[in-house]
């Protein structure tokens, strides 16, 4: 895989730090952070500021500039997180006297108002039916993401050897965030699709493209997007929408939060709550429906 590089900032010490900082992350995270940090670098360059000499006031003024650019709150927070991360490293390595982000208030995200792409039950049924008709790989991705909640990278890195049986349960060994391995059960409704993707092989990538090559994260995204379009879903759908669907359906069906958290392998329950369709559930279950129905009954 081609290494991710950052455009030079004009300050060699900062560029060396940035390259080292970026190398500490997985390639997918590197690509994301490589789109965030240059915005800070350009802002500093436009004001003749050496990033290693930046102050808290500079970071706060930059955040105001980013906020005025039309980006979403989540994107602004992500930009800040990248900048705050590199300054934590700079401070730990004594490259700066003080961390300019230490007392900066992180941009708030009002998660209850965020729009998250989640499939309805009927949409997922159409997605699954369409995937089954397209190819074994499409079908496997539909169940791995939409029934088991696997991330795109986790699906792409699955191997035939990761499939096995423990105490009578079919399982997959998944390598998650932070390269943490986890053994997850394959539910019976998903088992046939996984076995069809394996196709009696004993080794190699579990998911394959039409050419027979292994898949990467972007391939999984393309397959999910293509399946959604073929199923008549007009809005953009990616693998994480399938993962959110798992969490949303689980919580809406009354499965305990702890169990859904374990299914999604979240470190904190707040992440599980924040990843499902809060807005949709809140609207559907809002108490005003029952109150209004009761009161309307008295009007005849």
For the regions a protein language model found, what residue spans apply to each?
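C-terminal secondary-structure termini that scaffold catalytic or DNA-interacting sites
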Residues: 1-6, 290-300
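N-terminal core-binding DNA-recognition domain of tyrosine recombinases/integrases
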Residues: 15-31, 37-115, 130
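DNA breakage-rejoining catalytic core of tyrosine-based enzymes
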Residues: 96-98, 110-126, 179-188, 201-203, ...
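Basic, Lys/Arg- and aromatic-enriched nucleic-acid-binding interface segment
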Residues: 112, 121-152, 169, 178
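Catalytic-site neighborhood detector that most strongly recognizes the C-terminal catalytic loop/helix
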Residues: 118, 178, 264-289
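C-terminal catalytic core of tyrosine-transesterase DNA break-rejoin enzymes
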Residues: 143, 147, 243-267
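Conserved tyrosine-mediated DNA breakage-rejoining catalytic core shared by Y-recombinases
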Residues: 148, 153, 157-193
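Active-site/catalytic core of tyrosine-dependent DNA strand-transfer enzymes
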Residues: 187-234
């Amino acid at each position: 895989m081609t290494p991710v590089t950052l455009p030079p900032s004009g300050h060699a010490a900062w560029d060396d730090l940035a390259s080292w900082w970026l190398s500490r992350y997985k390639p997918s995270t590197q690509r994301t952070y490589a789109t965030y940090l240059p915005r800070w670098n350009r802002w500093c360059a436009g004001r003749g500021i050496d990033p290693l000499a930046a102050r808290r006031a500079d970071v706060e003024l930059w955040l105001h500039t980013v906020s005025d650019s039309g980006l979403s709150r989540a994107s602004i927070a992500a930009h800040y997180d990248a900048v705050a991360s590199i300054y934590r490293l700079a401070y730990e390595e004594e490259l700066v006297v003080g961390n300019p982000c230490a007392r900066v208030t992180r941009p708030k995200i009002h998660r209850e108002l965020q729009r998250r792409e989640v499939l309805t039950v009927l949409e997922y049924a159409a997605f699954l039916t369409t995937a089954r008709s397209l190819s074994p790989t499409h079908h496997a991705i539909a169940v791995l993401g939409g029934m088991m909640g696997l991330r795109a990278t986790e699906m792409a890195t699955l191997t035939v050897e990761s499939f096995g049986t423990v105490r009578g349960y079919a399982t997959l060994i998944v390598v998650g965030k932070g390269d943490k391995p986890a053994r997850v059960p394959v539910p019976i409704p998903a088992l046939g699709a996984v076995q069809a993707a394996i196709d009696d092989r004993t080794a190699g990538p579990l998911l394959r493209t039409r050419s027979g090559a292994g898949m990467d994260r972007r391939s999984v995204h393309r397959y999910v997007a293509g399946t959604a379009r073929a199923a008549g879903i007009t809005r953009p759908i990616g693998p994480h929408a399938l993962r959110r669907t798992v969490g949303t359906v689980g919580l809406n069906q009354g499965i305990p939060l702890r169990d859904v958290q374990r299914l999604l392998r979240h470190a904190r329950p707040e992440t599980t709550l924040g990843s499902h369709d809060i807005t949709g559930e809140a609207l559907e279950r809002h108490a005003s429906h029952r109150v209004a129905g009761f009161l309307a009954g008295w009007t005849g």
